[in-house]
Amino acid sequence: MTEGLLALGIEQLGLDLSPQNVADLELFLQEMTRWNQVHNLTAIDNEEGSIRLHLIDSIAVLPVMRRFLPQQNPKIADLGSGGGLPAIPIAIVEPNWRLTLIEAIRKKTAFLQHVRGKLKLKNIEVISDRVENVALQQSGQFDAVISRAFTNLARFLDLSLPLLKPDGLVFAMKAKRADEEMQNVSMQDWHLLADEPLHIPNLAVERRLLVLTPVRKLPLPI
C-alpha cells in the first residue's frame, strides 16, 4: 500500500480537500494504527493499508450527503462509531457539520476523545453510552444519522428513528446484501430516497449508500 493511496483516492472521488484536511486524515490514520496495536479498535489484517481504505470509504459518502443536507451546520449522529469511522473523517472535511459519536465500548470512546483533542476537532461530541439511552436523552435532536457498523438495516432504522428531527435522514452504508436487508424494512414506515453506488478506489467490493427518511414521525419532545 503506497503512501499516495489516500491522495489518489481523494482525487478519484472528485473531492476538493485542503492540505490541512489531508494532513489531519493522515494523522488520524497514524493514531488509529498506533492505538489498534494495543487496544484492538478494529479487526484489520494489513493495518495501515486497510485503515487507509476505510478512510476513503468514509469520505466517499460526502458527495451524496452534501446533496441531501442543505443545512449549513447539520447535526449528525454516528451510531456505533467504533474507531471513529465514518464520523472522524467527515468531521475533518466538514468542520461546520456537528457530529455526535455514540459508542458503548469505553476503550473505543477513550480513543475517540484522544483523537478529538489531538486533531482539535471542536465539531464532534463523544458519548460513551448505548444508543437506546442516548435516544431517551436527545430525542428528535438530529438532522441525520449515519453508521457503517450495523449489519441489520431494520435494527439500525429502529434505533435511528427516535433520534431524528421531523424529515430527518438516515444514511446507511451497506454492501451487496443491501437488497436483502431492505426486504425486512417496512415501506409503510420508511421512504427510500436514494440508493447510491459508492465507487471506492482500490477496494474491490460493492459499496452502497442508502438514504432513507421516516414516513411515520415521532412527536417532538416537549
UniProtKB/Swiss-Prot annotation:
Disulfide bonds: none annotated. Keywords: Cytoplasm, Methyltransferase, rRNA processing, S-adenosyl-L-methionine, Transferase. It catalyses: guanosine(527) in 16S rRNA + S-adenosyl-L-methionine = N(7)-methylguanosine(527) in 16S rRNA + S-adenosyl-L-homocysteine. S-adenosyl-L-methionine binds at G80, L85, V131, E132, R148. GO terms for cellular component: cytosol. Gene3D superfamilies: Vaccinia Virus protein VP39 (3.40.50.150). The keyword rRNA processing applies. It is found in: Cytoplasm. Its EC number is 2.1.1.170. One of its GO terms (molecular function) is rRNA (guanine-N7-)-methyltransferase activity. InterPro entries: rRNA_ssu_MeTfrase_G (IPR003682), SAM-dependent_MTases_sf (IPR029063). Belongs to the methyltransferase superfamily. RNA methyltransferase RsmG family. Specifically methylates the N7 position of guanine in position 527 of 16S rRNA. This is Ribosomal RNA small subunit methyltransferase G.
